Amino acid sequence: MTAGIDLNDIKRRMDGAINAFKSDLASLRTGRASANILDPVMVEAYGSRVALNTVANITVPEPRMLGVSIWDKSMVGAVDRAIRESNLGLNPIVDGQNLRIPLPELNEERRKSLVKVAHGYAENSKVAIRHVRRDGMDSLKKAEKDGEIGKDDARSLSEKLQKMTDDTISDIDRLLAEKEKEIMQV
């Protein structure tokens, strides 16, 4: 911790924004099956809404198929309904206490809309990172104004903060480009 500004805390907060972005990207459905696709699905269970992975086990038995093993047989209908109503474009096939979910081929229009969603996630993450930078700059200016640090130290810390911001945003751009390539791959 330098007087007035904690660069480690700022780095931790920026890393948090990147981790949130990675998790958002993982939930986007590409051509391959991934258990993360079902992360946003909430199931009406026992009088409240819970995440699907708290009432079932999600597997990927084949590249274009998801398997959902529901622990409580009475929950099969609720899980099936939750997946169908999740706007993921998935239609589960009930097989006893399990669901099989074939992943349809993505058409060009759907691919482009997924890329737009990914760009939206990236922009939200960049905004969060800029907010962290702004908080750091405000702390820096306050410390300089209060006489805790000198002008040279303030300038040096400001440059470090800007470099951290630039590096973090370039990481987000790189992750976005990788995901975009993955989505558009036929």
From Swiss-Prot:
Pfam families: RRF. GO terms for cellular component: cytosol. It comes from the Bacteria. The keyword Cell cycle does not apply. PANTHER family: MITOCHONDRIAL RIBOSOME RECYCLING FACTOR PSEUDO 1, RIBOSOME RECYCLING FACTOR. Belongs to the RRF family. NCBIfam families: frr. This is Ribosome-recycling factor. The lineage of its organism: Bacteria, Pseudomonadati, Pseudomonadota, Alphaproteobacteria, Hyphomicrobiales.
